[in-house]
């Protein structure tokens, strides 16, 4: 095909895509970052948060709040909704309120949390702290200085606070929950949000009592509640008549199976719409929802593999090689033998077989492999290890990992299972 024919084909493709019926009116409405004007089935939590924060409008310091519930139960969106409303109403009463939102999955050290708070005020103060390099005490001193420049209320929202505490300890929480004793003008309140209630076990009792002055629990949504949420968002997200009748109930039912996760429900609806749009379909159907479910699961599995520790990646690659050699199901001993050779090849200290057995269990729990214990009669019990993800997909993810790349050209000799 010459260049002119390529151009004609591409022209035709663009024309066809332009003529296709538009599916989305505003796709952003289905994203996690969107804060809607109303939050169905969270009015009780909204009211509780408002009651705790209303002292701000009277010029009094509100309590610190600990918010918890599973993923996708509306914690973050509800806290953002209430604090944004508080900020808006405070302007009417001429009360300065600053709300600083920090995602602790990204900002996960004591230093960086403090630096982010200081830098929030940089346009006002002209003071900016680099993300590394200063003594932490100096950053904390700057934080007190910038916050206390005038009378104001500062609400610090620490989302995924458990990630911060598990990685860096609770020192930053100790500082922030006691900062009011060191301020003359400003008043600070902390809202901690967590998916993991057990993380409180990691906290010093003094920090826990300060942070948990008030607690707000978010229970999972049921399928009917998820349906209401999706119906509300769909009205803004899609053009009229593009959703088949069964699409929203199916998205709600699939997400309800996973502890009532509204994020999962919104992702399913958005991805189903994207697939329908790419196919040039005039409607989003249940078939598109099932395709969306498959795509989301694949994407999640890729992310899980990508974030595995190096030893687990080498172990997984040993299982891939056995699979490509036709040697699955394999037992732990077979896998360990290949794993040891791979470690030798990249000069990595191998773990013990007992530890590798633990890592096999972890890969099994993550759903990447299946490690079923089977009885061999008088020979005892053994694990039969199989892949749940294709070798091709695993290779595709691992090829971007520089520490694993030297192994990707290796294969096994059929009989001896030796590396070649």
From Swiss-Prot:
Quaternary structure note: Homodimer. Interacts with MCM.
Residues engaged in binding ATP: 73-77, 221, 233
Keywords assigned by UniProt, alphabetized: ATP-binding, DNA replication, DNA-binding, Nucleotide-binding
SMART domains (UniProt xref): AAA, Cdc6_C
GO biological process, one term: DNA replication
Molecular function GO terms recorded: ATP binding; ATP hydrolysis activity; DNA binding
Recorded family membership: Belongs to the CDC6/cdc18 family.
Residues that span the membrane, as ranges: none
Keyword Chaperone carried by entry: no
Source organism, top-level taxon: Archaea
Listed name of the protein: ORC1-type DNA replication protein
Protein role: Involved in regulation of DNA replication. May play essential roles in origin recognition and cell cycle control of replication. Binds specifically to the oriC region, which alters the topological structure of the DNA and introduces localized melting of the DNA duplex. May recruit the MCM helicase onto the oriC region. Shows weak ATPase activity in the absence of DNA.
Organism field: Pyrococcus furiosus (strain ATCC 43587 / DSM 3638 / JCM 8422 / Vc1)
Pfam family, one: Cdc6_C
